[in-house]
Amino acid sequence: DNNIEYKDINTRATYFNSILWSGQIELEDSYMFTYYSLFDKSPPSFTKKFPKNHDMLMPFIDNKKIQQLIILSNGHYIMTNENNELIFWNLKLGQKGFDKNASPYIWSYVIEKTDQSEILLDETNEKMNALKIQEVRSFRNNRKYSEEFNNFMERLKGI
C-alpha cells in the first residue's frame, strides 16, 4: 500500500510471538524497515530509509573477511562512516528496539586497515589485505532488558 518499488522483501515475527511482525524492503540503493502489530489500526508504513552505501566497502571487497561478513549477512547490509570509522551493519537480525524505524541495527562491525607493516596470511599462506574487523555493537551490549520488554509490549498492543 506504500507504492514503493522494491527488489526484495523480508518479513518475520518478532521474538516470542506471532502478533508483532517486522518488515524490511530492499530498494536499489537503500533499505526500509517497519514494525506491524496485528492490533495496529492502520497498515504498515515504511518511512525511514537506510542508504546501502556499499561503495564504501569497495576498497576492501576482495578481502576474505569482508566476503565472510557479506555471506553472514545474506547480502543484507549497510555501510556508514561514523566519527571516521567505517561500520558494516548486518541487517539480518533487524533493529534494536521498536521506536518507529529509527533504532540502530543489532549487529555492526568496525572495519579498519591495520598497520602496513603487519602482514596477515590466510590458511593457504597467501598474503591478505591487512584488515581489522571488530564487533562494536551487538544485541548483548548495553541492554536495558526491562525497558526493552516494556517497549516491546507497548508496540505489540498496536498503534
Give the positions of each predicted feature.
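Alpha-helical transmembrane signal-anchor/signal-peptide segments
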Residues: 1-7
